[in-house]
Amino acid sequence: MALPYHILLFTVLLPSFTLTAPPPCRCMTSSSPYQEFLWRMRRPGNIDAPSHRSFSKGTPTFTAHTHMPRNCYNSATLCMHANTHYWTGKMINPSCPGGLGVTVCWTYFTHTGMSDGGGVQDQAREKHVKEVISQLTRVHSTSSPYKGLDLSKLHETLRTHTRLVSLFNTTLTGLHEVSAQNPTNCWICLPLDFRPYVSIPVPEEWNNFSTEINTTSVLVGPLVSNLEITHTSNLTCVKFSNTIDTTNSQCIRWVTPPTQIVCLPSGIFFVCGTSAYRCLNGSSESMCFLSFLVPPMTIYTEQDLYNYVVSKPRNKRVPILPFVIGAGVLGALGTGIGGITTSTQFYYKLSQELNGDMERVADSLVTLQDQLNSLAAVVLQNRRALDLLTAERGGTCLFLGEECCYYVNQSGIVTEKVKEIRDRIQRRAEELRNTGPWGLLSQWMPWILPFLGPLAAIILLLLFGPCIFNLLVNFVSSRIEAVKLQMEPKMQSKTKIYRRPLDRPASPRSDVNDIKCTPPEEISTAQPLLRPNSAGSS
C-alpha cells in the first residue's frame, strides 16, 4: 500500500529538522578536587578536628559557577551535563574563577537580581523572555476558531500548594515544640512580595554533621543574598587560608576546611556577609559561619490580625517566627534544658525543605507575575492591532464570528469583596470609638488590667494601713493593762499588813478620828491575826 504524498514528504524532510544537542561539558576533573566537610561529635559541646572525605581517584566531578562576569571570557559555547544546559569558556582574566587560561562552566541563567554585564547569561534571559512573549502572542492572535489561552503548562509549573502546606505544617510543629505559650489560634503568614530570608546560625552543640553526601555536581556562587541574621554570637565559623579576621569574638568555634572546594549537606549553608552559599572554593577573606535558612514568616494572633487589618495608628509588634523559635533555642542553650534537640532538628528539617522548595516557589511566583504582566501588555497591543487591521470588516468580534470576545477581569469582584470586608471592620471600629470614654478605655484595658491588682493593693495599704496599725497598738495596750490588773492582788498580798489591839474595841458611835490610840503593833503575815487571851479563852 502506497503512503500518502504528505506523509512521504514529511518522512523525507524529517531528518533535516532534527536539532543537534550541545556537546557534553568538559569541566570535569579526576584528581579529587572536591572534598567534603565532616564533623565528628564526641559529645555535646565538643567538636573533633575537622576531617574531610575525598572521592576516590578517577571519580569525575562537575563544577559550575552561578555567576560569571562578561569581562572574564571572549566567547562562550553551550554544553550539557545531566540534561541541563551550561555555558563554557576559557578565562582571560587572572582574577576570574579558575584563573587565566582555565576552561570553566557556569549556569545558563544567573540568579535573580544579578547581571553579568551584558554577557551570555543576560542574553539568554532576554531571549527566554522574548520567546515567552512570542508564544503568548501566537496563541492569542491565531486565526483559528477562538478557544482561549492554554495555561495548562503554566498551572503545572505553579503547583506549589503541597509544598506550602508542608512548609506551614513543619513551622507549626516547631513552634509548638519550642514556644512556651503553645499557641492554638494563630495565623502564620508568608508574604508574596520578596523579603530577605532569615539566617539561623547552627548551634555548636548540634551533632548532625556526620551525614554522608554523594554528589558529582558542585555549584559555586551565592544562592541567596540580603539575608537577615537573627543573632551574631556563639557562631561556628570557617577559617580559610586567606581569611583576615580570625580573632572575631562572635565565633565560639573555628574549623579549618581543606584548600579545595567544600560543600555542606542539604539544609545547611555557608553565610558570608549577607549571602548564602552551598559550596565554597576554599578561599574567602570575609568571615563565614554555618547556618540554617528559614522563610520570613510572621505569626499573628486573632487580635493582632484584627489590628493589622483595621490599620490602627499604633499596632502591637508581632513576633517573627525565626526570632520566636530562636529565643527557644537560645534559652535551651543557656539553661541546659532539652529544647536544643527539638529546635535544631526543626530548623534542619525546615531548612531542608526550603533548600529544595525556595527556588521553585520563588520562580513560580515570579513566573506567574511576569507572565501576567506580559500577557496584559501583549493582549492590549494585539487587540489594538487587530482592531486596526479588521476595521473594514467590523472589528475583531465580527471578524472572528463571535458574539462576545471581551475579557472579563474577575479580579474586580475580589477587590470589591475585600473592600466590603474592610468597610465592615472599619464601621465596627468606629462604633467602638463612638461609645464614649469607655471605648477608649476598652482599648487600653488589656494593658491596664495586669497592673490594677497590685495598684489597688498599694492604694488600700496606704489608706487603711495607719488605722489598722493604731488598732493593733490599742489592742496590745489593752491586753497589757488587763494583765496588770490581774497581777495586782498578788502583788499586794506580798506587802506588810497593820492591825490595832483587840482588847480595846472601838465604840460604835465614836468617830474614827476621835479615837486615841497608840501605834499598832507590827506583825507578820505569817502570824495569826487572833491570839488567845490570858485566861486561855479564844
Curated annotation (Swiss-Prot):
Specific enzymatic cleavages in vivo yield mature proteins. Envelope glycoproteins are synthesized as an inactive precursor that is heavily N-glycosylated and processed likely by furin in the Golgi to yield the mature SU and TM proteins. The cleavage site between SU and TM requires the minimal sequence [KR]-X-[KR]-R. The CXXC motif is highly conserved across a broad range of retroviral envelope proteins. It is thought to participate in the formation of a labile disulfide bond possibly with the CX6CC motif present in the transmembrane protein. InterPro entries: TLV/ENV_coat_polyprotein (IPR018154). One of its GO terms (biological process) is syncytium formation. Residues 320-340 are annotated as: Fusion peptide. It comes from the Eukaryota. Pfam families: TLV_coat. Residues 1-20 form the signal peptide. The keyword Transmembrane helix applies. GO terms for cellular component: plasma membrane. A motif (CX6CC) lies at residues 397-405. Residues 465-538 are cytoplasmic. Residues 496-538 are annotated as: Disordered. Residues 465-484 are annotated as: Essential for the fusiogenic function. The record marks 317-318 as: Cleavage. Residues 380-396 are annotated as: Immunosuppression. The chain crosses the membrane at residues 444-464. A motif (CXXC) lies at residues 186-189. Ortholog of the human HERV-W_7q21.2 envelope protein. Belongs to the gamma type-C retroviral envelope protein family. HERV class-I W env subfamily. PANTHER family: SYNCYTIN-1 (PTHR10424:SF48), VIRAL ENVELOPE PROTEIN (PTHR10424). The mature envelope protein (Env) consists of a trimer of SU-TM heterodimers attached probably by a labile interchain disulfide bond. Interacts with the C-type lectin CD209/DC-SIGN. The cytoplasmic region is essential for the fusiogenic function. The 17 amino acids long immunosuppressive region is present in many retroviral envelope proteins. Synthetic peptides derived from this relatively conserved sequence inhibit immune function in vitro and in vivo. This is Syncytin-1.
